[in-house]
Design a protein with these regions (language model features):
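Positively charged n-region of N-terminal signal peptides that target proteins for export
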Residues: 1-4
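Lipid interaction determinants
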Residues: 17-80, 95-154, 162-163, 167, ...
Length: 232
């Protein structure tokens, strides 16, 4: 099933909202002084859905300006979108593999979904269109699928995740130990980069090279290497 993201296309009342309100002709872009450091974090709430009782939406804005959106459709499936986020005044823009979505930052704790043109949505049905900051760490319901350029040199492994545009150190869960043997079999020279399809989660771990803590991508399921393929 095609991911239903851009989120505004999920909300049938938003896509078809015809309420005559003068504010609809103005964008929601107003300077507020928000910055990357005080916006990054986890936001969560249940949003309405056109063809299901609702969807539990969890948005993880990582400090490196990448994001993970988890949409758990009630009674159905869980899907993920990954990408980059940017901030212009009080407008949060998500550019993911499934399209672009925008939110208005109302305050430190609340962001509100905007329409496809970046305007406030005026909903006569009083459905909730906001996500609330959640101070608990992001824990995905399922392993997150990623694709990117993987390389290894001894015990040091890294991946450039295409959708996020960032490099992350890699660790292998016990269920993914076969990945290293598959990599050694597929490469033609030491540390050769290969396009990889993986599933896993992000986790803060001690660095292998120094005393700092780094954001690792922990592989839970190795799917495949695709020699010759590059990030689009």
């Amino acid at each position: 099933m095609k991911h239903l993201f851009v989120l505004t296309c999920l909300l049938f009342f938003a896509c078809n909202n015809k309420k005559n309100n003068n504010n609809n002709n103005r964008t929601a872009n107003q300077p507020t002084g928000f910055g990357t450091k005080n916006v990054a974090g986890v936001f969560y709430d249940t949003l309405p859905c056109a063809d299901c009782p609702g969807m539990a939406a969890k948005l993880y804005l990582k400090p490196d300006n990448s994001f993970i959106m988890e949409l758990a459709y009630i009674g159905k499936n869980v899907v993920y979108d990954l990408g980059k986020w940017s901030l212009t005044d009080s407008i949060l823009k998500l550019t993911g593999t499934e399209g672009i979505s925008q939110f208005k930052i109302l305050n430190h704790a609340t962001i509100k979904l905007l329409d496809n043109e970046g305007r406030m949505i005026y909903d006569t049905t009083n459905r909730r269109l906001t996500l609330q900051r959640n101070n608990t760490p992001f824990q995905p319901l399922q392993p997150v699928p990623v694709e990117g350029i993987f390389s290894a040199d001894g015990n040091t492994m890294n991946i450039l995740i295409c959708a996020m545009g960032n490099n992350y150190p890699v660790a292998l869960a016990p269920s993914a130990m076969s990945m290293k043997a598959a990599y050694n079999k597929a490469i033609h020279k030491k540390s050769e980069p290969l396009y990889a399809k993986l599933k896993g989660h992000f986790e803060l771990r001690p660095s292998l090279n120094d005393t700092t803590t780094k954001d690792f991508f922990v592989v839970e399921h190795f799917m495949a290497f695709v020699p010759g393929q590059q990030c689009k």
